[in-house]
Amino acid sequence: RILRREDVVFSGVEEEPVEVTAMLCFRRSGTNELGVELRTFRLTESESAALAVLEALLAGPSDAGLERLLPGGVEAWSARVDDGVCYADFSGALTEHIPESAQEQELIVRSIVESLCSLSYVQTVQIQVEGEVLRSYGTVELLPEQE
């Protein structure tokens, strides 16, 4: 039997895109301060807003008064949210190119954390590199010492 177009039935419905707005934190040009750029993402329910935020941080700002903070070559591998915690996993380039300045290191960490926490369902962030928990980024301690 030959199937015609009207014989084909799709199981499931196409996902409706939803709009998610996040505050992306970039460096204010020429300063050691963070500036905010509001960005709206159109995502389907199966797409991760947290991963979209990380990819936008890596792509850089559209506002001319802001600058990208994350080192070149860094990739966002994944971002999942579980019970208010966002697990953000990056490629090894994040730790291969740590800036010397402690202030710069802190800005990078704050950029990631504050951008992800602008999503209403993210309360805390755990930064990972290639699936391993990052305990510090240069001189910036990310996890308290275990007793």
Please state what every model-predicted region is.
Residues 1-147:
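Bimodal "functional hotspot" detector
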